[in-house]
UniProtKB/Swiss-Prot annotation:
Organism of this sequence: Streptococcus pneumoniae serotype 19F (strain G54)
Protein name per its UniProtKB record: Galactose-1-phosphate uridylyltransferase
Pathway entry: Carbohydrate metabolism; galactose metabolism
HAMAP family: GalP_UDP_trans (MF_00571)
Catalytic reaction equation(s): alpha-D-galactose 1-phosphate + UDP-alpha-D-glucose = alpha-D-glucose 1-phosphate + UDP-alpha-D-galactose
Keyword NADP: no
InterPro entries given in the database record: GalP_uridyl_Trfase_II, GalP_uridyl_Trfase_II_CS, GalP_Utransf_C, GalP_Utransf_N
GO-annotated molecular function: UDP-glucose:hexose-1-phosphate uridylyltransferase activity
Entry keyword annotation includes RNA-binding: no
Subcellular location: Cytoplasm
């Protein structure tokens, strides 16, 4: 069977198109790929593989230019053929939701996989492993899924006339967007609309997922990130409306926030993060909220966990803690609420529903800088930035390291160095490599060396999180943490 015939057969079997539409679909494919593909045979069987071959044929036929951007644009256009229109996707979702919210979510997830919006083949390239620590098992990923632009495309992007449509990658206007060299193609993108706390929001999956069913809840309007009482209301509304999913927000200040601060959004998914498994190491009750179980969890960052079957109690208490933290200073442990009116304090909140109760984790954040730590006092310090120098956002806070692609090769180089091979180690890794070599001077087994290096990366990630923690894992730090808790107001024994 020819490539086009196979692809069209898949489209018919996996969409609302019928056999009568075969000629129409064939012509739609030829219009995009080029008529020279008509006689091309294929041994491939899977829809996404067939799409990828069609894209390469379009490059061969010079229908599209040989660039990542052109490939992405054509690929999403082809997969749009198996994707119902937005109104139909929403209709199907809410009709299924009326009978089973879980089934509605599952159906939308499977659609986002089937139509290649979730980039399964790219995600499979990521390196992922777990490492033991004093705080339980942590998750390490080296992110290889996001394709990097080549120098030519980067140069072209600089020359492209500025456009504010869509305003950012989270706007509703991305749904069906053709794409350009400096904005991703989204022809096959679909968003579920829903109302939350009186406003329109969208629910979509993340194309380059970092964990199972990684999804995004985005404001229907282009509004900046802001942590407020509404954040707690929305997060708890999400975990109630989307059963089985957690929901969390990045902080809303530079250094401690995520990469997108211009559009209010939350992240969620069906994944148990290491932080969720962290036990309470100290428990107490807040005055006026006796029905809320509260405590500090055993975690490298500073986290208050609140649990209750009352959403209202959780929202009120979380807001009280947040308002107190925004204005709280303690010079004895270098905690400062503001400098000349510029705020330093915010919270990274995470919500989940567990054993029938609502749970909120409030991670205290401080974005101060100093002469010693110009990138941030509570940010990865210089000696660990060879592994992680980017902001510690929501996902890392919960114990999943997202490390840059460069580390794949660099980790292997350090392992080779440990067994005495003649390799060049990156300057910023040399001190680390020498330290590991002094600890393992007689190492000859390459696999064992690689395991040692990977474990060391995990140990450094623990340090990264400890650096980001405002109250350190010392007697002084934990005593200071309790001073803040007492400032909020707890019941004394």
């Amino acid at each position: 069977m020819t490539l086009v015939d196979k692809f069209v057969t898949h489209v018919i079997s996996e969409s609302s198109f019928e056999e009568m539409d075969r000629i129409y679909l064939t012509n739609r494919v030829l219009a995009r790929v080029g008529e020279g593909v008509l006689e091309v045979e294929t041994n491939l069987d899977k829809l996404i593989d067939l799409k990828d071959q069609l894209v390469e044929e379009a490059v061969r036929l010079e229908t599209i230019e040989d660039s990542q951007t052109a490939r992405e644009i054509l690929g999403t256009e082809l997969m749009d053929l198996v994707t119902p229109c937005p109104s139909q996707v929403n209709r199907d979702f809410w009709e299924a939701y009326a009978y089973s919210p879980e089934q509605a979510i599952e159906d939308f997830y499977q659609l986002s996989r089937k139509n290649d919006y979730i980039k399964l083949k790219a995600i499979a390239k990521n390196i992922a492993y777990r490492v033991p620590s004093d705080y339980g098992e942590l998750e390490i990923t080296i992110n290889l899924s996001k394709p990097e632009k080549d120098p030519k495309e980067i140069a072209v992007a600089k020359l492209v006339q500025a456009s504010n449509y869509p305003q950012c990658q989270l706007c509703l206007e991305n749904e069906g967007y053709h794409g350009r060299v400096n904005h991703p193609a989204r022809s096959n993108h679909r968003i579920i609309r829903f109302e939350m706390v009186g406003q329109e929001w969208g629910f979509q999956y993340s194309p380059y997922a970092y964990f199972n069913e990684h999804c995004i809840f985005l404001d229907g309007q282009h509004r900046p990130m802001a942590i407020s009482r509404q954040s707690f209301e929305r997060l708890l509304a999400i975990v109630e409306q989307f059963p089985g999913y957690f929901a969390g927000s990045n902080a809303d200040l530079p250094i401690v926030g995520g990469s997108i601060l211009t559009h209010d959004h939350y992240q969620g998914g069906r994944h148990v993060f290491p932080m969720e498994l962290a036990p309470l190491q100290k428990t107490f009750r807040f005055a006026g909220f006796e029905q809320v179980k509260a405590g500090i969890i055993k975690w490298p960052m500073s986290v208050l966990r609140l649990t209750s079957d009352s959403k209202e109690d959780l929202i009120n208490l979380a807001d009280k803690i947040f308002q107190e933290w925004r204005q709280y200073s303690d010079s004895s442990v270098q905690i400062l609420a503001e400098t000349d009116g510029t705020p330093h304090h915010t919270i990274t909140p995470i919500a989940r529903k567990r054993d029938g109760q609502f749970e909120l984790d409030l991670v205290l954040r401080d974005n101060q800088t100093s002469a010693e730590h110009p990138d941030g006092i509570y940010h990865p310090h210089k000696d660990v930035q060879h592994i992680k120098k980017e902001n510690i956002g929501l996902i890392e806070v919960m114990g999943l390291a997202i490390l840059p692609p460069r580390l794949k090769e660099e980790v292997e180089q350090v392992a080779s160095y440990l067994v005495g091979e003649a390799v060049t180690v990156a300057d910023y890794h040399q001190e680390w490599a020498d330290q590991l070599k002094s600890q393992h001077p007689d190492l000859t087994d390459k696999e064992k060396a690689l395991a040692i290096v990977k474990d060391s990366v995990g140990a450094i990630f623990v340090r990264v999180l400890e650096d980001a923690g405002v109250y350190k894992q010392t007697e002084q730090g934990q005593t200071a943490f309790m001073r803040f808790v007492e400032q909020v107001g707890i019941l004394l024994d």
